[in-house]
A protein has these predicted regions:
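Canonical Rossmann dinucleotide-binding motif of NAD(H)/NADP(H)-dependent dehydrogenases/reductases
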Residues: 2-33
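Catalytic Tyr-X3-Lys loop
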Residues: 106-129, 144, 148, 172-173, ...
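A short, exposed helix-loop element centered on a Lys and neighboring polar residues
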Residues: 132-133, 178
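Alpha-helical segment proximal to the catalytic Tyr-Lys
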Residues: 137, 181-183, 234
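Short, small/polar-rich loop/turn modules that mediate ligand/substrate recognition or access, typified
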Residues: 185-190, 236-238
Length: 254
């Protein structure tokens, strides 16, 4: 696969799968606009990518829940590279974990302060919604593009304490992705959701069961995203693709 001259925006790109995608995309010749709220880590990652890859990376500080900042990322991408070919919404996380909520003090869903869940909905659902709204203006103009949402097995399974995460991911997987694919079709814009099961971005994921008997490697998820974005993946549109080692098929065997 090659992405020479292609332009991607990746949120949550200072670490995890967002960073891994950015590294892969640049290594394959693509230019990438990396967004994150962690400025120091982001700029270091950008510098490392630019030191050893064909493609160019730029870093833009962005809170995905702030629409004005989202539009600024879009504008910077167009100013720097002239177009936006791919938009990948990596930024997200379970609010209770990301906000370091003490579950001994707040043990159940109704006990957790609502502002914690507001953060989760803002980042996990409104963020991708905002980026789609902003980037589609450019993609419509250029009559091409791809939006990739990152869902989760949690969107299909539910989560008693992480309801913000499960609700948001389900919204991406089944509502936003299909709606964007329907809207984008006349403009040659696709939308696909990639929904991982347990992936070894955190040690805790190793204990989750799958039919293949292991958690996924981050590179396996990124490889699927790259395939969808490549010339070989052009017939994939409007779908939520589970990449979960068969976890969603386990049913009562979990």
């Amino acid at each position: 696969m090659e992405f020479n001259g292609k332009v991607a925006i990746a949120t949550g790109a200072a670490s995890g799968m967002g960073l891994l995608f950015s590294q892969n995309f640049a290594a394959l010749g693509g230019n990438v606009v990396m967004c994150d709220v962690s400025e120091e880590v982001l700029l270091k990652s950008v510098e490392e990518i630019n030191a050893k890859n064909q493609g160019k990376a730029i870093g833009v500080l962005c809170d995905v829940s702030d629409y004005n900042q989202v539009c600024a990322v879009r504008d910077r991408a167009v100013e720097e590279f002239g177009r936006i070919d791919i938009m990948v919404n990596f930024a997200g996380g379970t609010a209770v974990r990301m906000r370091q909520v003490d579950t001994n003090i707040y043990p159940e869903f109704p006990d957790v302060p609502i502002d914690v869940y507001d953060w989760g909905i803002d980042v996990n659902l409104k963020g991708p919604f905002y980026f789609a709204h902003a980037c589609l203006k450019q993609m419509r103009k250029q009559n091409s593009g791809l939006i990739i949402n990152i869902g989760s097995i949690t969107g299909a399974e539910g989560a008693t304490l992480g309801m913000d995460y499960a609700t948001s991911k389900a919204g991406l997987m089944y509502g936003l992705t299909k709606s964007l694919a329907q809207y984008g079709a006349p403009y040659n814009v696709r939308c696909v959701c990639v929904s991982p099961g347990p992936v070894l971005t955190r040690a805790a994921m190793a204990t989750m069961k799958t039919l293949v008997g292991r958690a996924g490697e981050p590179q396996e998820i990124v490889d699927l995203i790259l395939f969808i974005a490549s010339s070989k993946g052009q017939f994939i549109n409007g779908e939520n693709i589970m990449i979960d080692g068969g976890r969603n098929a386990m049913g009562r065997w979990k």
